[in-house]
Amino acid sequence: MASIQNLYETVSRVLGNQAGKVISALGEITVECLPEHYISVMTALRDHEELHFELLVDLCGVDYSTYKNEAWQGKRFAVVSQLLSVKNNQRIRVRVWVSDDDFPVVESVVDIYNSADWYEREAFDLYGIMFNNHPDLRRILTDYGFVGHPFRKDFPISGYVEMRYDEEQKRVIYQPVTIEPREITPRIVREENYGGQ
């Protein structure tokens, strides 16, 4: 097993200018790239004989709009992939920043890693990130009629619609949310009455 420093140097050399940044922190390597280099970076990480990251073990969307409880200055959305090289016993993270915050789109990597199929559908469903050339990009966790993308940080906690069974229509129907926010008043316990004394 090669060291993290060796992996850092190899990845930097192999990817060259395609990688916007190669970061070594906390014993992990993260490659940050632009959307236009995403496919070539993922292909190089899989196919290069010194790297051989043959497995995509996770892919997710991230909404950085309020990262670390403060306003974020960069791009709002990113797609983060975790790759594994069984041959070299190494892991690497790839982060691609989505260029348009209003209509987030990146290329699909299903043709490179077929395990990305449902992960990309999940990122689309929960964050609204579109994946160009995905073979079946549709919702996977929420209803087909669901409004919005629930993991976006600007999505309301109570949602927009709720579903219930309508006895008259004998079916499940959607209606606007009827939940009223509650005011929670903390209960004060006085020492003299504490414990039933």
UniProtKB/Swiss-Prot annotation:
Membrane topology: Peripheral membrane protein
Single GO cellular component term: plasma membrane
Superkingdom to which the source organism belongs: Bacteria
Enzyme Commission code: 7.1.1.-
Annotated signal peptide: none
InterPro entries named in the record: NADH_DH_suC, NADH_quin_OxRdtase_su_C/D-like, NADH_UbQ_OxRdtase_30kDa_su, NADH_UbQ_OxRdtase_CS
Subcellular location, record wording: Cell inner membrane
Enzyme class: translocase
GO function terms (MF aspect): NADH dehydrogenase (ubiquinone) activity; NADH:ubiquinone reductase (non-electrogenic) activity; quinone binding
Keywords recorded for this protein, A-Z: Cell inner membrane, Cell membrane, Membrane, NAD, Quinone, Translocase, Transport, Ubiquinone
Catalytic activity: a quinone + NADH + 5 H(+)(in) = a quinol + NAD(+) + 4 H(+)(out)
Function summary: NDH-1 shuttles electrons from NADH, via FMN and iron-sulfur (Fe-S) centers, to quinones in the respiratory chain. The immediate electron acceptor for the enzyme in this species is believed to be ubiquinone. Couples the redox reaction to proton translocation (for every two electrons transferred, four hydrogen ions are translocated across the cytoplasmic membrane), and thus conserves the redox energy in a proton gradient.
Alphabetized NCBIfam families for the sequence: NuoC_fam (TIGR01961), PRK06074.1-1 (NF004730)
Family the UniProt entry places it in: Belongs to the complex I 30 kDa subunit family.
Subunit note: NDH-1 is composed of 14 different subunits. Subunits NuoB, C, D, E, F, and G constitute the peripheral sector of the complex.
Official protein name in the record: NADH-quinone oxidoreductase subunit C
Source organism of the structure: Neisseria meningitidis serogroup C / serotype 2a (strain ATCC 700532 / DSM 15464 / FAM18)
